[in-house]
């Protein structure tokens, strides 16, 4: 459900939007037949039953202002609340496991963008953004726990674009990212890193283009990975979070060709990505 109002004239574009999203999975059941071997050899049936529902109201405010012949100023603010309820029941014969999670997520983000068109087929802009999330999760069932995580990221970016002739375009977006997050009972963690996005494109004609892109950035782990919780997978495995995860750093470079031949659209090219401190599962015996 969504409701939007706007006011538009030559000097400004203002809008406000209220939305409500609700999702529900009343029942999702999977049945299996398990064969155990080793010290004990036997067969058993398993049932994995899940129920999930989500409710999320949100408010978004937007304003775009023409402050000169070639200058624009744009603001966006959005706040949302999400309530997630998740229940999982797992059984093998007479053995029963229950996990019940109730999560409250508060999210706020703000952005301000200034852009000016210059005289030589180029433009310059400044982009300021902030993202803030607060998550509280209550776990019940096999393991009881309360987890609270807040994360925040502030970014400052410069935008510069330059067109050379009719075919070549360059876009540069260097910037900085200041990231903070804290899990309940743990120390605050702070990271400052470079953030950039660059694109160089050559347009052969109206239907063919070749583009080289290079990006570098960071990402924060969410509460589903950064926590102090044990959750039952089955009666041999336990899923355990890690409260000491670092921020994930991402580097990507790609060469992309896009061509239109009649009704056929061809898109493809090579790419290479590097992820450091990437979240991945680790299995070990206890």
Where are these regions (language model features)?
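Primarily recognizes Gram-negative and organellar outer-membrane beta-barrels
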Residues: 1-286
């Amino acid at each position: 459900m969504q409701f939007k109002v706007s006011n538009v004239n030559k000097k400004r574009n203002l809008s406000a939007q209220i939305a409500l999203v609700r999702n529900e999975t009343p029942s999702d059941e999977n049945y299996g037949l398990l064969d155990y071997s080793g010290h004990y050899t036997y067969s058993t049936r398993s049932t994995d039953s899940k129920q999930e529902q989500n409710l999320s109201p949100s408010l978004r405010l937007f304003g775009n202002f023409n402050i000169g012949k070639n200058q624009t100023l744009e603001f966006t603010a959005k706040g949302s609340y999400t309530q997630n309820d998740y229940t999982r029941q797992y059984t093998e014969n007479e053995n029963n496991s229950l996990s019940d999670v109730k999560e409250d997520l508060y999210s706020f983000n703000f952005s301000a963008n200034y852009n000016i068109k210059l005289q030589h087929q180029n433009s310059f802009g400044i982009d300021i953004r902030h993202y803030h999330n607060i998550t509280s999760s209550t776990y019940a069932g096999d393991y009881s726990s309360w987890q609270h995580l807040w994360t925040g990221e502030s970014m400052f970016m410069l935008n510069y674009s330059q067109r050379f002739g009719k075919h070549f375009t360059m876009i540069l977006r260097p910037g900085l990212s200041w990231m903070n997050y804290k899990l309940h009972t743990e120390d605050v963690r702070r990271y400052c890193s470079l953030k950039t996005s660059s694109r160089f494109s050559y347009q052969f004609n109206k239907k063919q283009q070749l583009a080289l892109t290079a990006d570098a950035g960071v990402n924060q782990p969410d509460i589903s990975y950064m926590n102090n919780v044990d959750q039952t997978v089955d009666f041999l495995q336990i899923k355990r979070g890690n409260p000491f995860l670092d921020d994930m750093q991402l580097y990507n470079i790609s060469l992309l060709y896009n061509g239109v031949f009649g009704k056929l659209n061809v898109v493809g090219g090579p790419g290479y990505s590097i992820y450091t401190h990437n979240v991945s599962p680790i299995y070990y015996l206890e």
